[in-house]
Amino acid sequence: MSRTKRPVRWITAAVIVVAAAVGLYLFQPWRLVTTDRVDEAPPAATGQQGAAAKPLATGSFISHEHDTSGSVEVQQLEGGKATLRLTNLRTSDGPALHVWLSDQPVKQADGGNLDDGKHIDLGSLKGNEGNQNYVIPAGTDLNKFSTVTIWCERFSASFGAAELKQRA
């Protein structure tokens, strides 16, 4: 092997190693096979033990970029506070997953529109399976936000979404 080819091979190997490391960091492919289960208790409407929260709106997830299922419920708590409850959620794990309320409608085939209008980020997804609660900020007009989505911020993609239907 000539001396001029050795540096080229070392540089090529270094570029491949760096590209692989960056790709692993960005895409986190191991998250496709990991599960993070959460089982939070439902919030109580009052300080009285056993009191139930009042349901304001409900919906069921449909799949977008990844298979997603489960139900959502907006619940009225003591003092006018509201919470979003995800029940029996099942979706893929992924990088930078958040729970959003969106003012955009749910589309069956694609959730790419859900970041087009206004949205409220309720926080990072606590787990890709199970039951979990998210506080809805005070002053949120739930008539303007009719969709819940599991949103991947890194890839600007909806894993799944649910249309909120107001309860009478």
Regions inferred by a protein language model and the residue ranges of each:
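Beta-strand signatures of extracellular beta-sandwich domains
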Residues: 98-100
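Short, exposed beta-strand-loop hairpins at the edges of beta-sheets
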Residues: 137-160
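An anionic, turn-rich surface loop/hairpin at beta-sheet edges
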Residues: 109-137
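Extracytoplasmic/periplasmic copper-protein system
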Residues: 163-168
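Transition segment at domain starts
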Residues: 25-80, 114-117
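N-terminal post-signal-peptidase region of extra-cytosolic proteins
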Residues: 71-72, 82-87, 132-136
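Hydrophobic membrane-insertion alpha-helices, especially the h-region
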Residues: 9-25
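Terminal targeting segments of Actinobacterial cell-envelope proteins
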Residues: 1-6
